[in-house]
Regions:
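TPR-adjacent "capping" and linker segments in tetratricopeptide-repeat scaffold/adaptor proteins
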Residues: 21-43, 77-85, 187-193
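Alpha-helical segment of the N-proximal tetratricopeptide repeat
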Residues: 34-73, 88, 92-101, 112, ...
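Start-of-helix register in tetratricopeptide repeats
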Residues: 42, 81, 88, 122, ...
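Register position in tetratricopeptide repeats
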Residues: 53, 99, 133-134, 167-168, ...
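Conserved structural position within tetratricopeptide repeats
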Residues: 69, 111-115, 145-149, 179-183, ...
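Short coil turns that delineate tetratricopeptide repeat
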Residues: 72, 84, 118, 152, ...
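Canonical tetratricopeptide repeat
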Residues: 92, 126, 160, 194, ...
Length: 315
């Protein structure tokens, strides 16, 4: 037994000798640190994504942010050198930040993604949607233009670009972009939803410009295409009828709006203005009361009368 122990000890020593002789070495503290960072990254990423799916956005943001820290990501560095796992975390983090309303931070993550994947159209679509919520129409235009360099015939990008133009007061380009979006969307069977969005915005814009006939054409198309009543479309038709001086028909469509959404404050407000213009003070007062119940913050500023164009007299 003593002899066997000596042999075992010798084997251990020989192994150590050969390891040193041939350049082998035990795992360094730096290697262990990297292994631990990789494990931390995976755990934090998994926990962050799971928290997102459970609607726990605060915890998701914390986990995903710490996952980037575990990877020792340089936020000021070149994102094009980041690996796919880091980019996936940025993608999830941008979504969580959007859900939380942290739009500027979400935009920063999307900007890093766009640096790493400049040919990914969907990144620019999301950037445009985020900047629209931020009301930063210049940045929104820039994001749309970047996306359209990748695909100039994307109907949704054209729709977003139109909204950016409208936000900057460029009505001519708004109509032009919407018209192009409609033509492209209507060529595709699956493009009906986008065509509806673009037609609705174009109809609303044309009506504001005083082009009642053009707005009516869009509204008629929408009413024909949609199987179920849509509040915004009914509201557009009501306003068109009012602009045409057809008060009773307009009231009929405001009634339909309220049937679809009993809490449509704007429908009560505008219908009340028509009742007042017709001399029906009883119904005008009822609509005004309904409107103020939904907007109690305006009650102190209202005298109780509506102007015919749909605005209440204020003190």
């Amino acid at each position: 037994m003593f002899f066997i122990k000596i042999i075992i000890d010798l084997n251990i020593d020989f192994m150590g000798f050969f390891k040193r002789f041939f350049g082998g070495k035990s795992e360094s503290s730096e290697d262990k640190k990297e292994d631990q960072s990789a494990k931390d990254f995976e755990v934090l990423k998994y926990d962050g994504v799971r928290a997102m799916h459970q609607g726990q956005m605060d915890y998701a943001i914390k986990c995903l942010t710490n996952a980037l820290l575990a990877k020792q990501v340089d936020e000021e560095g070149d994102a094009s050198k980041e690996d796919q796992e880091v980019l996936e975390v940025r993608d999830f983090l941008s979504l969580a930040l959007i859900q939380k309303g942290e739009l500027a931070q979400a935009y920063d993550q999307l900007r890093k993604l766009s640096e790493a994947q400049p040919d990914n159209k969907q990144i620019f679509v999301r950037m445009a949607e985020v900047t629209y919520m931020m009301e930063d129409y210049g940045a929104m235009s820039h994001a749309c233009e970047k996306g359209m360099l990748i695909d100039k015939d994307d109907a949704h990008l054209l729709f977003l670009y139109a909204k950016a133009c409208l936000g900057q007061g460029d009505v001519i380009n708004t109509i032009a972009m919407l018209t192009k979006s409609i033509l492209l969307a209507e060529k595709k069977q699956e493009g009906l939803a986008q065509a509806v969005q673009s037609r609705l915005l174009r109809g609303e814009t044309l009506l504001k410009l005083g082009d009642v006939k053009g707005a009516e054409e869009d509204a008629a198309w929408l009413l024909e295409q949609l199987e179920e009543p849509v509040e915004e479309v009914l509201l557009l038709e009501a306003r068109i009828l009012l602009a045409q001086g057809k008060m009773d028909d307009a009231i009929s469509y405001y009634n339909k709006v309220i049937d679809v959404n009993p809490f449509s404050a704007i429908a009560f407000k505008e219908r009340g203005a028509i009742y007042l213009a017709k001399g029906d003070k009883v119904n005008a007062e009822k609509d005004m009361q309904s409107y103020l119940e939904m907007n109690p913050q305006e009650a102190d500023a209202v005298t109780g009368e509506f102007k015919a164009e749909g605005k209440e007299h204020c003190r």
